[in-house]
Design a protein with these regions (language model features):
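Extreme N-terminal starter segment of soluble prokaryotic enzymes
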Residues: 1-5
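Glycine-rich active-site loop/strand segments that organize a redox cofactor
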Residues: 36-102, 217-254
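General small-molecule cofactor/ligand-binding pocket signal
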Residues: 117-119, 215
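Generic recognition of long tandem-repeat/solenoid scaffolds
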Residues: 135-139
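Core beta-strand elements of the Rossmann-like FAD/NAD(P) dinucleotide-binding domain
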Residues: 140-149, 184
């Protein structure tokens, strides 16, 4: 196993990678874990550090545990801090960011001789030495760290058309708290896409007293549908030890 790993990006994926490395049983060598993020926030990332608690998760609390063997972990964490939470609640995204940060802190406290270095910096280059196989990670601060392994966890990047829009002064990043500060209450707000983030954006604008017009452009022209319970009749036809592939095959059978 590598004795040093750089993780670029400290959102959900980067944070969970760091947690799993910190949980690795002790061997002959400990692991130096470098978790690097320019935001200085380790855990929430962009998705779970929205401008207000009006931005909600799109999965119920009881199913948002970070680990597959503990799917109710987040719900227990939430109940300890917010006792009125029910298993079926859609909790604020910011709460999930706090949960991830707590998991990281706990993993570091229980690390098996491994060390986590949290670096508030931006990675500007990665080069691999052909002879040693090690990675040189160049940082905006001017520092360079040399590691045995490198994980790129920079999130879901914007597509080319959205990236080009960022250069205009009217572009707003929906998860940036400052994005809504200078929007006139009577302006027209154009929203590209009609998914859950579009709904979050509208709710945030409404809460800030927006009285203007929303123009929404979407390929399918539909808002998200509400979650529905699976009919008991459908469950009855599933095999006892079902999985996704097996269910698809069963549906294909005449």
């Amino acid at each position: 196993m590598p004795t040093s790993v750089a993780i670029i990006g400290a959102g959900f994926s980067g944070t969970l990678t760091a947690i799993h490395l910190a949980r690795t049983p002790a061997t002959d060598s400990s692991i130096d874990i470098y978790l690097i993020d320019p935001r200085g926030s380790f855990g929430p990332g962009l998705a779970y550090s929205p401008p207000s608690e009006r931005f909600k998760l799109n999965v119920r609390a009881k199913a948002m545990g970070a680990f597959p063997d503990d799917v109710e972990g987040f719900y227990r964490w939430e109940r300890e801090r917010y006792p009125n939470t029910s298993p079926d609640d859609f909790c604020p995204r910011s709460h999930y960011g706090e949960y991830l940060s707590d998991l990281l802190n706990k993993a570091v406290g229980q690390a098996h001789g491994h060390t986590l270095h949290r670096l508030t910096d931006e990675v500007i280059g990665i080069d691999r030495n052909a002879d040693s196989g090690k990675w040189a990670v160049s940082l905006k601060s001017g520092d360079t760290i040399t590691v045995d392994g490198c994980v790129i966890a920079i999130g879901n990047l914007m597509n080319a058309s959205t990236t080009s829009a960022q250069s205009t002064i009217r572009f707003r990043e929906p998860f940036n708290p400052k994005s809504y500060d200078d929007i006139s209450k009577s302006q027209t707000v154009f929203i590209l896409g009609s998914g859950l983030t579009a709904v979050d954006t509208i709710l945030e604008c409404e809460a800030r007293g927006f009285t203007g017009t929303y123009t929404i452009l979407s390929r399918h022209g539909r808002f998200p549908r509400p979650h529905e319970s699976l009919p008991s009749s459908a469950v009855a036809h599933l095999p006892e030890n079902w999985n996704t592939c097996g269910s698809v095959r069963a549906l294909d059978e005449p």
